[in-house]
């Protein structure tokens, strides 16, 4: 499916730090970010993986991930949508990011054509079932205004990283007037962090 998607003229896919058994010291440098930026004004970020177990109706265990939708009609320079875009660009341009493939000829392969058709049919089925949610949603009605959104991340290089997010959270918490509310699918705290 990645070949099918990346064969589209408007799609580029890069791999972050592709696993290389000849460089085992880099294998722990993984990227687990999940975000989608649309039109430079809206983004979704969260913890949802793109496997059926995490999406849709999967029998058995239900997994409830937290996604955040941010809508900004007129983003200013220091707005979080621009912060996220700059973060994306920094990762995209890293030496450790390489194109999934560079061959336009792949689109002519029968297996890729089949994958493209399956993706198109899957989207059409999804659209038919969810048409009302997709077309008739007033996002202004379903969101609430914030004074500020602060996006945090640990370093994005592939070497060992300092855990700077906890320090950044601590600095933000020092500025709280009444309480602190953290919305994240990722945080796992130890005893020291709870105190």
Locate the predicted segments by residue.
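Charged, low-complexity intrinsically disordered terminal segments
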Residues: 1-14, 18-34, 38-195
